[in-house]
Amino acid sequence: MLSTMPRASLILIALILATASAGPVAQQSKPQSAQTKPLFSEDFESGKLDPNVWTQQITGDNVITVQQDKVAHGKYALKVSCPVPAQRTLALLFAKNLPEPLRHHLFGRAYVYITSGVPARHTIFFTAGTTGFPASKYQEVATSNGNFQVTFIDRADANEDWHAAGQVPVNRWFLLEWEFNDQPDQATVWVDGEKVIDTPFSYHTPGQSTDLVGGFTDITLGFRLRGAAPVPFDIYYDDVALDAHRIGAVR
C-alpha cells in the first residue's frame, strides 16, 4: 500500500515517525541575559549624591554637583569644577568599604568629559587604596602634561612609582577603563576600548612588586591637583563602576 503513495507523503510520514520516536524536542536555550550589575556602581540618576555612599572633600572655590547640562547617558552626571585659578587644590568624592572581591584586584569604568583647561601638572582622577587618602597607600589614574598617568604612592615613605602614556581627550566624552592589581602590582588603562598603558609597579625591589597597597578598601573620584591650575576647568563623570572583571561600555 505504501508503494502506491506519492513520494512527498512518504517523506512526511517518515518525519512524523522520527519526531515521535525521538521524544520531546529539546527547548532552545535563551539568549544571554543583560550584563549583571557591577559590584560597585554609580550612574547619578537619582539626581543627588547618596550620603550613605559618598563623602566630599573640597578646597577653595571648587564645586561638586550632580547636573543635567552635560551627560553621557541618562539624565544626570557628576561635575567637579575648578572655577578660578588655583594652586594645589581638590574636589573629591570618597567611598569606603569596597566589596571584598575588589580588595586586591579590580576593574573600573567611567565616562569622562574634560574641558581643555585641565592643568598640565599632575592631576589625579581616581584612586583606590587604604583609608586615609592622601596619607595612605594607593594606585591612581591621573594626568600629567596632557597624558594619562598611573601611579603607586606610599605617602609614609614619600615615594612613588609612576608611568605615563596616551593623550587625554578633551572637550568630548570618552570611555575610560582601568585595572588595578595589588598581587602582583600592576595597572592598565584603556581609552575608548584601546589600551594606552599596561605596566607593573616596582618599588623597593629589583622587579615587579606585590601587595604594595595592602588592599583596596577606599576610592576617590574627582580631581586633586598637585600643582597650579592657571585657568578654570571642569571634569564630568558618568556611569562609574567597579567589578572583578573588565566591565566595558554601557549597553
Predicted regions and their residues:
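Extracellular, beta-strand-rich glycan-interacting domains
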Residues: 42, 231-248
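Bacterial N-terminal signal peptides
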Residues: 10-20
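Localized edge beta-strand/strand-to-loop motifs within extracellular or lumenal beta-rich domains
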Residues: 172-188
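Flexible glycan-contacting loops in extracellular carbohydrate-active proteins
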Residues: 200-235
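Secretory/extracellular carbohydrate-interaction modules
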Residues: 75, 79-150, 241-250
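Extracellular carbohydrate-recognition regions
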Residues: 29-58, 238, 251
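Short, aromatic/His-centered strand-loop micro-motif at the edge of beta-sheets
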Residues: 153-175
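Extracellular glycan-recognition surfaces and repeat-rich motifs
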Residues: 48-80
